[in-house]
C-alpha cells in the first residue's frame, strides 16, 4: 500500500480541533515522498522554475486532505492566511486561489510577504481555520 501521508517537519500537528473550530497549520506543496509540487528543474546546472500556481493548487489539495481527517472540507474554511515569498507572484497565486474560493462566498483572507519559507523551493505556504460542528 502506498503511503501518501505527509508528516509534519516540526513539533506541531497538521490540525488542531478546538470545539467546532479546526486550525490547519501552515501547509506547503510538499508531497509524501518529500518533493514539492511546482518545482521544475530546467537545466543540468540545477536551475529551477518555481510555479506559484502549481504550488498553490497543491497546497489547497494538502489542506483538503488535512481537513478530511477532521471530517471537514474546504467549504468549511472561514479564514485563510497566505504567506508569499515574492509579491510578484500575487497574480498567479490569486488566479489559482480563485479556482476554488471566490470573493462572494469564500473565506476571509490575509496575504502577506515573508522573507523565506522552510525550504528554498517553496514560494507559498497557507494556514486556514475552518468551522465544522462536531
Residue ranges and their predicted role:
Residues 1-61, 65-78, 84-134:
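N-terminal presequence-like segments and the immediate start of the first folded domain
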